[in-house]
Amino acid sequence: MEKSEAERPVTTEEGEEKPTVPGKGIYHYIAEAWNKPDKSYVKKLQFERLIQWRQEENFLRIEHPTRLDRARKLGFKAKQGYVIVRGRVRKGSLRINKITVRKNLQRIVEERAGKRYPNLEVLNSYWVGSDGKQEWYEIIMVDPYHPVILSDPKINWICEPQHKGRATRGLTSAGKRGRGLRTKGKGAEKVRPSIRAHDRQGK
């Protein structure tokens, strides 16, 4: 019986065969648990975390990301120049009929974080929790003047002047989703080149 790709041994540079162990990586298990937090170990952790988070100041800089899989997927690296900030925003509407900000809560948190830390640029953000009144997000921020960032070819694009104020211009992942740029073709005729170019009919 022929072995599958996962079971075939890997040949090293010295010519030795190193057997591979089929299985899933740690990021897969983290993502699986966060995909349905109410049915995994995350539920108990979140109950304890939210008690502490409610007492903390808003837009608090933290040492490590709560969701390592999402942080890495959205561009975070454990190196100098990267900063993780946890912020919260109120849930619900403005309580005025038919008057909305036309922005998702994630984008609002990103904009406020950018104002709180004007020397940093918002790279992306991800959801980490909610209760009956508030939503919590962790924002990945980058220092565009840090020498480590300037010398990294994978991220030094953010140091260029045209990328200033990414969050306020809707250029993050959450911003593009809120502007309808995840949709192409039929039904998306009025979202490009911009929402205001079509008198806001794209939303």
Task: Name each region found by the language model.
Residues 1-80, 94-203:
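Low-complexity, rRNA-contacting terminal tracts
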Residues 84-87:
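RNA pseudouridine synthases
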Residues 90-91:
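Polyanion/phosphate-binding surface patch
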